[in-house]
Amino acid sequence: MSHPSLGLPPSDLTAGLPAAADRMRAAKERLAGRALEVALAETPGMRERYDEAGLRRRLRDAELMIERVALCVASGDTQYAKGYADMVSPLYRRRFVPLDDQIALCNGIRAALPGVLPPTELPAAGEALDAAIEVYRWHRRLAGDARKKNAILQFLYKGG
């Protein structure tokens, strides 16, 4: 994605696979539901961490990520997913949402996409999801993430 104040042209949303992006947007709710199911099945303790309202928020998060991945697929540029992940990471930290749960949602989206996209279009979406996961992993290392800490290191650090 070009920066507008640098005088560079904006990204072309027809440079990638706009038809695939349209199919993703049309099936956004179904994809998000399946992605959340996969994330809940693959991530131990995720179902216990959230009540019904929290699960609805994670479902909405999956829908928003699918929209960003669709933009990446349409433009052929992963910057939309990277920028979104970078923008929302502090918000999740403030809400005590582990970024590992967001990574699980991204992997759930990846597992749900073959129902909508043919195998030739999956790599474009996979690149966008990999870019978002990379950003989430980078932010996960910062202090304040709600992930489970190493008990031994916490004992040594706090002095028990």
Language-model-derived ranges and their functions:
Residues M1-N107, A111-G160:
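Core of compact, soluble alpha-helical bundle domains
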